């Protein structure tokens, strides 16, 4: 089944700004999040589709590649394999992207026809990490175990058996590319024997089987900064896959996903919560306590408060990564109707209702206004 256009998935224009793309992603991710749609396979599929679209369009290089070549330009299945459970950023258009960006992701740095082994930068890796809202707000240090490729200790990354060394490729004479002519046309292609490295290995290393790298699990320290938001990435330089022929290692990108909170809903640096209050407090007013990420806070509910009223507590939200002050906490009160009343309680409420009726409409102005608008339906 053909993939949908990434801009169509997020519902944005092709010239949408980074902020518009991020806003659209947040809205759709919240709508289709599996925690909000348990057991809903359609929602799960939409969530994955939205996440994939945002990963591509939020990265300037991948967005440029997608704009020019479509899905083929960013399809990881057409490039080198990354570590298990990770998304590699390499692609099958190294020569084309090398001209556009100077160096292909996970590919070789081109040298303007210069002979010699091609130097390859290691592929970038991606690691998804779930954290709580409290951890996102306050920040913390943690460790992650990352399955990755590392340079082989036996051959020191050369891929050759100890005591031997890679030799210059006889097909391309070490340039990593060959030129094929057909009629008036001449095309330069990656060497089929050495695959662009400029060398080949007569006697491969028995430990890594000539790859020059082996898979192992690394433990890395990760510092989660206070105020980080859902979908943001932390870059760990040099902790991606190792380079080839002395090339630099790629980077590791830790993508943050914040778990749904039982009380709060985040909107940027602001927090929202729904809070039930007794109908007596709503009618008479009073002081109530609310939870915040920093502890308890209190505010006064004025008498006559209606259900759905929103109260703003300044500075009780989250201090974002780029903010000098914290956001606000919005408390949406819901007036709770008492249930399972005893007979004495029922009698008291009936007496109260009678007193309200005798007092006229001044006690229930909204009811009077509503009945005035609909009385024609009952005539």
Curated annotation (Swiss-Prot):
Zn(2+) 1 binds at residues 152, 155, 205, 208. Residues 5-70 form the J domain. Its cofactor is Zn(2+). The keyword Cytoplasm applies. SUPFAM superfamilies: Chaperone J-domain, DnaJ/Hsp40 cysteine-rich domain, HSP40/DnaJ peptide-binding domain. CXXCXGXG motif repeats lie at residues 152-159, 169-176, 191-198, 205-212. One of its GO terms (cellular component) is cytoplasm. CDD domains: DnaJ (cd06257), DnaJ_C (cd10747), DnaJ_zf (cd10719). PROSITE patterns: DNAJ_1 (PS00636), DNAJ_2 (PS50076), ZF_CR (PS51188). A zinc finger (CR-type) spans 139-217. Pfam families: DnaJ (PF00226), DnaJ_C (PF01556), DnaJ_CXXCXGXG (PF00684). The keyword Metal-binding applies. GO terms for molecular function: ATP binding; heat shock protein binding; unfolded protein binding; zinc ion binding. It comes from the Bacteria. Homodimer. NCBIfam families: DnaJ_bact (TIGR02349), PRK10767.1 (NF008035). Belongs to the DnaJ family. The J domain is necessary and sufficient to stimulate DnaK ATPase activity. Zinc center 1 plays an important role in the autonomous, DnaK-independent chaperone activity of DnaJ. Zinc center 2 is essential for interaction with DnaK and for DnaJ activity. This is Chaperone protein DnaJ. It comes from Paraburkholderia phytofirmans (strain DSM 17436 / LMG 22146 / PsJN) (Burkholderia phytofirmans). The lineage of its organism: Bacteria, Pseudomonadati, Pseudomonadota, Betaproteobacteria, Burkholderiales. The gene is dnaJ.
